[in-house]
């Protein structure tokens, strides 16, 4: 059984989370979101979604929020309300 993971934010830290998720056997990276797109080219064959609501709609079990700090609270609250386990970057 693997964890269906989504990552919000594909900037400096998000790209590292994508790499580590892909290297972890128990993780199935299923969704990425960043309203600014994929500037580091890490998405591969995954589409880049527009935001947290689309991540939730993708049916994820867990999420990593690697977006700018100003967006943490709203994203974390939306994920919590949807029952998605979440790691929030500092």
Give the location of each predicted region.
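Beta-loop-alpha module in the N-terminal Rossmann-like domain of NAD(P)-dependent dehydrogenases
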Residues: 46-89
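N-terminal Rossmann-like dinucleotide-binding module
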Residues: 1-44
């Amino acid at each position: 059984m693997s964890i269906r993971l989504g990552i919000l934010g594909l900037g400096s830290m998000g790209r590292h989370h994508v790499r580590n998720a892909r290297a972890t056997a128990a993780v199935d990276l299923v969704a990425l979101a960043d309203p600014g797109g994929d500037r580091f080219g890490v998405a591969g064959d995954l589409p880049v979604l527009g935001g947290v609501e689309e991540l939730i709609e993708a049916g994820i079990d867990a999420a990593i929020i690697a977006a700018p700090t100003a967006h943490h609270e709203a994203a974390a609250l939306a994920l919590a309300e949807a029952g998605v386990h979440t790691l929030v970057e500092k």
